């Protein structure tokens, strides 16, 4: 089942032409969407520490700003993942790329890459950047999304959508990346496409815009 998903997802992503948002004033960043194959296809998220300069305390995929020395956005995503989680880039098969996705107010344009990891990795999280590592089965996110009217920041309104998983709220740019990712996974037949629901009750308000 897992290998079948890998093959089909690679086919779907190979046929996808990633859309580039035109934001010349933005700072480019890259993230890896890591899928661990066994015991079932599972996503790795990080909970960022409260001492980081941006997106502090939020749940995110591993990644960060693209440096001038990075040969490509994909290389930056793998480098940042290794720095944050100690994950050997050689253990990651990059299946493809999603559309670039901007953060609303922090000025980043995110290049997202989907990576396949065949065996459970021995992670070594960097305590300066990572407070906690979350391992979330893809099927736990399938077909569910919580949409909210939005929030205000410096006089502007921003739409908000989020997943709630085991009392963790995954929102902001990470939630938008999950939606993109699940659309592609749904095209393989492994899960259903993301839905829209407001039936979960209250969830904590985001502490900072993303």
Locate the predicted segments by residue.
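Amphipathic alpha-helical blocks and their helix-capping loop/short-beta junctions
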Residues: 125-157
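N-terminal leader/linker segments that precede catalytic domains of diphosphate-processing enzymes
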Residues: 1-60, 65-121, 130, 151-153, ...
């Amino acid at each position: 089942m897992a290998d079948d998903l890998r093959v089909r997802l690679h086919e779907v992503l190979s046929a996808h032409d990633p859309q580039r948002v035109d934001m010349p004033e933005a700072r480019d960043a890259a993230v890896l969407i890591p899928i661990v194959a066994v015991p079932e296809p599972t996503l790795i998220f990080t909970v960022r520490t409260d001492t980081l300069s941006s997106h502090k305390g939020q749940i995110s995929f591993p990644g960060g700003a693209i440096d001038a020395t990075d040969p490509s956005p994909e290389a930056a995503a793998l480098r940042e993942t290794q720095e944050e989680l100690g994950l050997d880039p050689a253990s990651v098969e990059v299946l493809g790329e999603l559309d670039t996705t901007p953060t609303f107010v922090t000025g980043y344009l995110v290049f997202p890459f989907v990576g396949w990891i065949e065996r459970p990795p021995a992670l070594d999280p960097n305590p300066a950047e990572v407070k906690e590592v979350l391992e979330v089965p893809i099927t736990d996110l399938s077909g569910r999304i919580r949409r909210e009217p939005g929030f205000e920041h410096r006089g502007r309104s921003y739409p908000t959508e989020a997943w709630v998983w085991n009392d963790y709220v995954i929102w902001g740019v990470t939630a938008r990346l999950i939606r993109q990712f699940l659309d592609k996974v749904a095209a393989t037949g492994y899960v259903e496409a993301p839905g829209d629901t407001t039936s979960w009750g209250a969830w904590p308000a985001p502490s900072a815009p993303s």
